[in-house]
């Protein structure tokens, strides 16, 4: 995707399935074009994505991405912004 975008992984099947959150976050980053970012919105049930998702993304993508924790949403979920470098 050659634009900045967001994906919501915070409701329904994601709330109790951390593996699904990680798998779909990896897929979202893969679909993001070089030079753009995806805001990955994660469930409140798993807490701050820096504690579980950031490590998984770094293990998969290495230096091809940069990440920044943005904030906790008013709805309770969390936003992790992931930039695709190449």
Predicted regions and their residues:
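Short, hydrophobic/π-rich interface segment
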Residues: 27-69
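Surface-exposed beta-strand edges and their flanking turn/coil or helix-capping segments
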Residues: 21-24, 53-55, 80-82
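An N-terminal amphipathic alpha-helical segment
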Residues: 1-34
